[in-house]
């Protein structure tokens, strides 16, 4: 078993923990309505791995899910989203012979579209593949366009700017 891949991949807790409690909740990378730029964006963090029950040969550990990737699509004219663009975090593994002992899933990644016109009715998704206790945090989606004609869906809600920032690394 191992921690999930991506920046901030979690560690390997032991089982059983000293006490059982509620679920941990992943944090959010900023607030969609307050994003002013997404220049230095990264993929999502990996989920925490889970060790098996010490001394048991029937309960092995499981690995955390990988974090979602970072996708940048830029055009000097137009981007049309007709299908699905996804940067989802992977689901954490489940310990053998158990259904309740699950490693953490990776958080969603980042999607950034930059063009004078963004259109289409497709979907943009940057979320964790899991729900409930083992879910990772949502990712981020940013649309930078002077003419937004995109009528599709985003999960999580995208931040939108009419100012197109530089797309070159380090700029």
Where are these regions (language model features)?
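Glycine-centric low-complexity/flexibility signal
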Residues: 1-112, 116-121, 126-139
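Extracellular/surface-exposed low-complexity segments
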Residues: 137-171
């Amino acid at each position: 078993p191992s921690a999930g891949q991506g920046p901030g991949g979690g560690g390997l807790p032991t089982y059983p923990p000293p006490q059982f409690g509620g679920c941990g909740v992943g944090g959010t990378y900023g607030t969609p309505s307050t994003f002013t730029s997404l220049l230095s964006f990264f993929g999502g963090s990996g989920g925490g791995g889970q060790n098996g029950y010490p001394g048991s040969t029937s309960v092995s550990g499981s690995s955390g899910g990988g974090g979602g990737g970072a996708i940048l699509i830029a055009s000097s004219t137009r981007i049309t989203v007709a299908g699905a663009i996804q940067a989802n975090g992977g689901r954490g593994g489940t310990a053998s012979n158990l259904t309740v002992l699950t490693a953490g899933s990776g958080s969603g990644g980042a999607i950034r579209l930059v063009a004078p016109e963004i259109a289409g009715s497709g979907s943009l998704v940057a979320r964790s593949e899991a729900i409930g206790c083992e879910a990772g945090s949502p990712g981020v989606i940013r649309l930078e366009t002077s003419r937004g004609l995109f009528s599709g869906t985003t999960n999580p809600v995208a931040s939108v700017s009419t100012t197109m920032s530089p797309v070159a690394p380090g700029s």
